[in-house]
A protein has these predicted regions:
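Solvent-exposed, polar/charged alpha-helical surfaces in well-ordered, non-transmembrane soluble domains
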Residues: 20, 24, 28, 80-83, ...
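Short, non-transmembrane amphipathic alpha-helical segments
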Residues: 73-96
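Short amphipathic alpha-helical surface micro-motifs
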Residues: 16, 46-47, 81-84
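Polar/charged, Gly/Pro-rich intrinsically disordered segments
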Residues: 21-23, 27-69, 94-173
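Soluble non-cytosolic domains of exported or imported proteins
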Residues: 12-20, 72-80
Length: 173
């Protein structure tokens, strides 16, 4: 059927419902984790899908993005929290087809360069696809985490590309 206003509204409603449910589960099961932002999206294949369970039954695609807050000094520390977030999300009434967990430092990397202290010039992104990856250990999640280096403005654009490598993050005159 057409992507009519009815299906659109249902998608939005289920996306919001999913966001709220996931956030509540994270607060209950992992109260130490600081969530900066969370957004769930439901893409419905047909207007048959009325509940989150319907979406999981093959009537749509669910994705969830969780942005974390705080300071991580390693990918391992980030991955531990990703595991806790994933545990919480797995208790929701529906499972995400895609779970994306991200973290960026609060400080301005340029300032930490100027002050000579180089903490927090990395940002982390973990993308889990499909239900099998939701069962991964924190170690597997750490390996899957993409690390981007935020050393200067020029690098922020190249950080978008998959091919971004550590060597290109050296400062050029």
């Amino acid at each position: 059927d057409e992507l009519g206003p009815e299906r659109n509204q249902a998608s939005m409603k289920l996306g919001q419902e999913y966001t709220t449910e996931a956030y509540d589960k994270i607060k209950q099961t992992a109260p130490d984790i600081r969530v900066k932002n969370i957004s769930g999206n439901a893409y419905l294949y047909s207007s048959e899908a009325k509940t989150l369970r319907d979406v999981n039954a093959g009537n749509g695609y669910l994705s969830l993005t969780v942005e974390l807050f705080g300071s991580y000094d390693s990918v391992q520390a980030f991955a531990q929290d990703c595991r806790s977030v994933t545990d919480a999300v797995q208790q929701c009434s529906a499972q995400p087809d895609e779970l994306r967990i991200t973290w960026s430092p609060e400080n301005d990397p340029g300032q930490s360069l100027a002050s000579g202290s180089l903490q927090n010039v990395e940002q982390y992104t973990l993308e889990l696809e499909g239900i099998a990856q939701l069962d991964w250990t924190a170690d597997q999640m750490a390996k899957q985490t993409e690390v981007q280096y935020l050393l200067d403005e020029e690098n922020e654009e190249t950080a978008e590309s998959e091919a971004f490598s550590e060597e290109s993050s050296e400062l050029s005159e």
